[in-house]
Amino acid sequence: MFWVNGLPQTHVPLGDRSFQYGDGCFSTIKTKKGQLEHWQAHVERMEACLTTLQIPFPDWRTVLDWAMSATLKDESAGIKIHISRGCGGRGYSPSGVEGPVVTISNFSFPAHYLAWQERGVQLGVCETRLGIQPLLAGHKHNNRIEQVLAKAEIDGTEFADAVTLNVQNHVIETTMANLFWVKDEKVFTPGLCLSGVAGVMRRKVLEYLQSEGYSVQVADFTLTDLLDADEVWMCNSLLGVAPVSGISAPENKIDFPIGKLTRRLQGNLNT
């Protein structure tokens, strides 16, 4: 079901700038028995994107009320909060736009995520490369055509997800989650200054690791670096933390054990 600015709707205006240009941002939030998880972190991430896009903030207290009304009361479920600049403007120009417009939808928790969390995920490697755009890197803006193309590439293969690299051949993420790995008891994760999305669960993983005294190296890494790992996991807000049990590169297939740190993170961050 969908709500637009708090009211049930089945359509959006054709002049909405998110429909026309992908002009806005969104966040997907896990809910537990009707309660939103990591709400403040999601707000902060949306605010960072809206600031970059020069879109006014909505009234977050009102948005929270709308979101709470929209949540399913299941043990686990999710909502998507989608913010558009609004309708209007001439061509690309945002001048004169009235907004923002907040659309909220709810959905059931994907049942297969439980199997992924327990047994791990086998990843492929996408040929589709992510572009370089430092202004938008890290933000979950509404133009996700790169992810659509990457996901289309792996549809129909044996893989549920795949590693994506950017045009500089640096590992960035999967099509739907952030990546971490361990090598010689050190933790690594790709930097997202040029490409990719900085997820809320990525932030929570970093915060937990730092609180436990781990030094995490955030930098540019190649596929070879990733394949040389001792332990790999992926994460997003809905999935939580899930082990990566193997990666099939074009000429190399590597299996990974489900490591102790992955299980420890799951015990502390997965709910």
Swiss-Prot record:
PROSITE patterns with a match to the protein in the record: AA_TRANSFER_CLASS_4
UniProt record, GO biological process: 4-aminobenzoate biosynthetic process; folic acid biosynthetic process; tetrahydrofolate biosynthetic process
Reaction catalysis annotation: 4-amino-4-deoxychorismate = 4-aminobenzoate + pyruvate + H(+)
Keyword line: Folate biosynthesis, Lyase, Pyridoxal phosphate
Enzyme class: lyase
Keyword Lyase: yes
Domain of life: Bacteria
A GO term for molecular function: 4-amino-4-deoxychorismate lyase activity
GO cellular component, one term: cytosol
Self-association state and partner proteins as the record states: Homodimer.
Family of the protein in this entry: Belongs to the class-IV pyridoxal-phosphate-dependent aminotransferase family.
Stated name of the protein: Aminodeoxychorismate lyase
